[in-house]
Amino acid sequence: MPLQPPSKTIVVQNAAVCPPGEQKIVCQDVNFTLTGGKALGIIGPTASGKSSLARMLVGVWSPLRGTVRLDGATLDQWSPEALGRHVGYLPQDVELFPGNVAQNIARFEDPPNPEAVLAAAQAAGVHDLIVNLPDGYETKVGERGSALSAGQAQRIALARALYRDPFLVVLDEPNSNLDAEGDEALTRAILGLRARGAIAVVVAHRPSAIAGVDYILVMAKGRQQQFVPKEEVLTRVAQPPAAPRTLKVVPGEGGSA
């Protein structure tokens, strides 16, 4: 029996992952719950396991142990086609494929839905940018296509992640190539996801990427350290020098939202 579209929660329990074909665990002891309308920022130093966690959340990499569940069903209980409809993913290394802009946003769905393409572009705040390209949504990209800046490609890829309103959207350093206008569009997109009851997970290197989230997960050395409300992190970081406080790190602390 086909599963119903997810609409309530993502639950990660004691999850660990290693890259396919390798034996070294790069991310472990991950525990958290998010409900629809919430957004999570994942922060931590370089090589702390953030991107590996993102790949596990969307099913690109399968957990070595533990589970990732959408509305109670583990990711491997969904067919790849169904999971693809319910999950949007913007990887750290953005790639647009040979074709036009509309096809890339529609994930090469055949035929693409024009209304859904437009809605995704508007949700990503990239519609005006696209209509100013040489051929608008028909502009060719990829090999032998129009040369786009890294920021333009990243914003179009954000629209692709939002296509057809997926329940879970995972964005890995989505503003690494964005200017101030792109940052603002990203924050609006995250707030838009929350407003329609979706879940957003944002791997962040620049603070502006987490402006629209309400929870923070801290990673270090491949392990979850904390899962706390964003305000708690900001309050601790903002303590004046006369009364210094540091973020208390509790290995393996889980949480729910």
Q: Residues of each region from the PLM?
A:
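ABC ATPase nucleotide-binding domain helical subdomain, centered on the C-loop/LSGGQ "ABC signature"
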Residues: 69, 77, 102-143, 187-188, ...
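Conserved catalytic segment of ABC-fold P-loop ATPases
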Residues: 211-218
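Conserved ABC transporter NBD signature motif
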Residues: 66-73, 83
